[in-house]
């Protein structure tokens, strides 16, 4: 049945194919790793991921379907700002941004880092273009019962004039962050509309 070294030849050929397959797989993995490294070192801050678009639209009170999120999100203008002593300066990317401002259909949303219950997170706050009302707010990276209370509130003198329990550090942090976003968005809004 296995005359003239058929089995030996078959095994030799199989071994050669395995070596070639493993070698080509290693080189393709190296190529993929190189591409991932290049892509991760150059984040495209001009595009917003769909998850962030959801947070922004929720803060703005924009009703949309998940299916339409990406196409609607292409119309959101995004601006990144650093801040020092209450003065905001435009920066080119999300890295080191203290405030990110989204503008869509004459409504603003601000995003800023926040620490809630010891967790680092981001808060999104939607603000009407006349800076008289907070539309809604939400968190990314933490959960808090406070989020439901910071919506449909009036703004006066660039801040919310509400009181929170002084013993509740999360409530104080939340209010400070919301007021920081309101003040920041109002200060930089002339730069966005010109």
From Swiss-Prot:
Q: Where is the secretion signal located?
A: 1-21
Q: Which domain of life is it from?
A: Bacteria
Q: Where in the cell is it found?
A: Cell outer membrane
What is this entry's stated membrane topology?
Answer: Lipid-anchor
GO cellular component terms, alphabetically, are:
cell outer membrane
Taking the record's annotation, the residue ranges forming a coiled coil are: none
Q: Where do we find N-palmitoyl cysteine lipid attachment?
A: 22
The keyword Membrane is annotated on this UniProt entry: yes
Q: Where does this protein chiefly localize?
A: membrane
Q: Which residues cross the membrane?
A: none
Ordered alphabetically, the record's keywords are: Cell outer membrane, Lipoprotein, Membrane, Palmitate, Signal
Covalently lipidated residues (S-diacylglycerol cysteine) read 22
Q: What is the name of the protein in this document?
A: Outer surface 22 kDa lipoprotein
């Amino acid at each position: 049945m296995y005359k003239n070294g058929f089995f030996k030849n078959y095994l030799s050929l199989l071994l050669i194919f395995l070596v070639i397959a493993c070698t080509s797989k290693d080189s393709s993995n190296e190529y993929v790793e190189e591409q991932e490294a290049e892509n991760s070192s150059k984040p495209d801050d001009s595009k917003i991921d769909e998850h962030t678009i959801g947070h922004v639209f929720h803060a703005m009170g924009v009703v949309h379907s998940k299916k339409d999120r990406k196409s609607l999100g292409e119309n959101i203008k995004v601006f990144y700002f650093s801040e020092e002593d209450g003065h905001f300066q435009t920066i080119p990317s999300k890295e080191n941004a203290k405030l990110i401002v989204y503008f869509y259909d004459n409504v603003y949303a601000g995003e800023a880092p926040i620490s809630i219950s010891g967790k680092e997170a981001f808060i999104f706050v939607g603000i009407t273009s006349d800076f008289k009302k907070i539309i809604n707010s939400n968190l990314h990276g933490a959960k808090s019962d406070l989020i439901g209370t910071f919506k449909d509130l009036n703004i006066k003198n660039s801040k919310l004039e509400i009181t929170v329990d002084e013993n509740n550090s999360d409530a104080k942090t939340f209010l400070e962050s919301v007021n920081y976003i309101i003040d920041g968005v109002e200060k930089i809004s002339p730069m966005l509309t010109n």
